[in-house]
Swiss-Prot record:
This is SsrA-binding protein. GO terms for cellular component: cytosol. One of its GO terms (biological process) is trans-translation. GO terms for molecular function: RNA binding. The lineage of its organism: Bacteria, Pseudomonadati, Campylobacterota, Epsilonproteobacteria, Campylobacterales. Transmembrane segments: none annotated. SUPFAM superfamilies: Small protein B (SmpB). It is found in: Cytoplasm.
Amino acid sequence: MAINIVAQNKKARHDYEILEKFEAGIVLSGAEVKALRAKRANLSDAFCRFIKGELYLMNAHIAHLETANKYFTPDTRAPRKLLLHKKELEKLYVKVHKDGLTIVPLMIYFNERNYAKVSIAIAKGKKLHDKRADMKAKTLDREAKTAMKNRSY
């Protein structure tokens, strides 16, 4: 059984250079898990932050399902705690505070055991000229592939 991707942060790959990836668990309520199974999540403006030595996913939108809980409307952009091993947390803390890097969520998915997981990465912000160079390389690669595809023998 493969992983079931719920939401991806495509903006992160465009705005940041990904250095190292991690897999983290996430603390959710039952209604939020139900919303994730319905693929009602968005990571476009999400980021990670340390609060009192723990890592939290901030500004990630997980929609409220009307069928899940009728009498309580949770905050859809509430901070959600990420679950990592202590050594991983220490490594991330050092990278963020000493090296000036950022932690970016890449995607939310359900793994083989049907647990909700968040793929996070240590990333370095790209400058405008880096983004332009990446776009130019992608267009050149795309043009080369189409030229090879359309080439007749």
